[in-house]
From Swiss-Prot:
A lipid is attached at C23 (N-palmitoyl cysteine). This is Uncharacterized lipoprotein MG045. It is found in: Cell membrane. It comes from Mycoplasma genitalium (strain ATCC 33530 / DSM 19775 / NCTC 10195 / G37). Gene3D superfamilies: Periplasmic binding protein-like II (3.40.190.10). Residues 1-22 form the signal peptide. Pfam families: Lipoprotein_8. Keywords: Cell membrane, Lipoprotein, Membrane, Palmitate, Signal. A lipid is attached at C23 (S-diacylglycerol cysteine).
Length: 483
């Protein structure tokens, strides 16, 4: 899901148990999935606020961390937010504390969750609507959107014609993998080892997009087994493809796809983008391995699981409410009501060697994480920074000195590709294959769906303890027998 950290946050290491024993209502703890935040931004936040930063591997660990009062602020997926709401563990978001306007051209203040919708892309507005039986049916009342993502299929090498058609489904993808199995044999196909994510995908495949709901309808183990076996019924088995590489560490998955050691994989779109940029191995790849527009392809099926992660505040830590809102602003909302010109400003006076050192926290985080920002100013398909319809080169050049522009001529594939992605200066240095890749990346940042499907059908909701147990058992059994 995330990239390896490039910077060290702590000068010494302590055991997790000793960290936890020192945490609680007297210590502000910011918690997140590993490598799901810009290290430079985290350093800035730590300079302003004394806090402990911890990571967790799953939403279930996050929920436990809130229940035992360890975490003050954390990132949670939608279904985890729903569960935390039901367990009365969240403090409502006071949107007035952020001192935001509804847009850069508006003087109207954002005072509540309803006002806040104006800051976000359209998909967020629908996803934020919770089920009718929840305590409050507006997700934005309890949480601040952090990043949005959906599942895509990545493959290396020549294009597969069946996957270049419009309205490709996940069933089409699985059939294409099986048809072209010689490309993916010998452990060259990779899946994320996450029971819930793969179930969501399998459920869409199982219904052949007819119901297109990623959430389970039953709780028996036979039901979950049958859904997982939808892959087997289409021929996606280790007996047919020799073996399938399944790994829970998305960093490994990203780098395997970036290097070409794996020829295909099902990953989140942000991870696909980072792999397209070379992943953590970009400085080590040979010319033949480096992804470009001819050998790296991202397929976005028309109906695909969607994940929205949000920042939440622990209700039990009432003494940290002011700090919690300030930190959430720094991580996710700083720049949300600004113009694009303001959003892409950098601070050269700080003397950093990192070219992606943005003044606004939301832009700094986006430039590192590479997932879809929920903010309209960044991700709106017509007016956002990541848009093929606008050119930001002129606004960027106005902010740069002659010396800076000269120094940026020094070519680096990774930064040049990111510049082209954001339509900054010097994108002409990219060759045609690299420009094709940039267009592929831009498309990956646009998450769309079939008009007949509601966003909430594609977002995971809470499941019962029995469903969770049977889902996990069925997944383990399926992997053992078929993958």
């Amino acid at each position: 899901m995330k990239k390896q950290l490039k910077y060290c946050f702590f000068s010494l290491f302590v055991s997790l148990s000793s960290i936890l024993s020192s945490c609680g209502s007297t210590t502000f703890v910011l918690a997140n999935f590993e490598s799901y935040i810009s290290p430079l931004l985290l350093e800035r936040v730590q300079e302003k606020h004394p806090l402990t930063f911890l990571t967790y591997p799953s939403n279930e660990k996050l929920i436990n961390g809130f229940a035992n009062n360890t975490y003050s602020v954390a990132v949670a997926s939608t279904y985890a937010v729903s569960e935390l709401i039901e367990r009365d563990l969240l403090s409502p978001i006071d949107w007035s504390q952020f001192n935001l306007k509804k847009s850069s051209s508006s003087s109207d203040k954002v005072n509540n969750a309803s006002d806040a919708k104006d800051l976000f892309i359209d998909s967020i507005k629908e996803i934020s609507q919770q089920t009718k039986d929840s305590k409050n049916n507006e997700l934005l009342h309890w949480a601040v959107p952090y990043f949005l993502q959906n599942l895509v299929f990545v493959y290396r090498g020549e294009k597969i014609s069946e996957l270049e058609q419009e309205n490709v489904s996940w069933t089409d993808v699985i059939k294409a993998i099986v048809k072209h199995k010689d490309r993916f044999n010998d452990n060259r196909l990779v899946f994320i080892d996450d029971a819930r994510t793969i179930f969501s995908l399998a459920n869409i495949v199982n219904t052949n997009n007819n119901s297109a709901d990623v959430n389970p309808k039953e709780d028996g183990i036979g039901y979950f087994t049958n859904v997982y076996e939808s892959f087997q019924r289409l021929g996606l088995t280790k007996s047919n493809l020799d073996s399938i590489f399944v790994n829970s560490d998305s960093n490994i998955v990203i780098n395997e796809l970036a290097s070409g050691r794996r020829q295909g994989g099902i990953v989140y779109n942000g991870d696909a983008v980072y792999a397209a940029l070379g992943g953590d191995l970009r400085d080590e790849l040979s010319e033949e391995q480096i992804p470009d527009g001819n050998n790296f392809h991202i397929v976005q099926p028309k109906i695909s699981p969607v994940a929205l992660d949000l920042l939440v505040i622990n209700k039990q830590q009432s003494n940290f409410q002011k700090e919690a809102h300030e930190i959430i602003f720094d991580l996710a909302l700083d720049g949300a009501d600004q113009t694009k010109e303001q959003l892409i400003k950098t601070d050269e006076e700080l003397g950093t060697d990192d070219e992606d050192f943005y003044l606004k926290g939301a832009m700094q985080n986006f430039s590192y994480v590479n997932y879809v920002s929920p903010l309209k100013v960044i991700s709106d398909p017509s007016t956002g920074i990541v848009s093929s319809k606008k050119n930001n080169a002129e606004m960027k050049s106005k902010q740069m000195s002659t010396d800076q522009m000269t120094s940026e001529k020094e070519f680096d594939y990774y930064t040049e590709t990111l510049k082209a992605l954001l339509e900054k200066e010097d994108s002409a240095e990219l060759n045609e294959n690299e420009k094709k890749l940039v267009e592929t990346i831009k498309k990956a940042y646009t998450i769309e769906k079939d008009s007949s499907i509601r966003w909430n059908q594609l977002v995971e909701k809470p499941i019962s303890p029995l469903q969770r147990s049977n889902l996990s058992l069925s997944w383990l059994d399926f992997k053992l027998h078929w993958w």
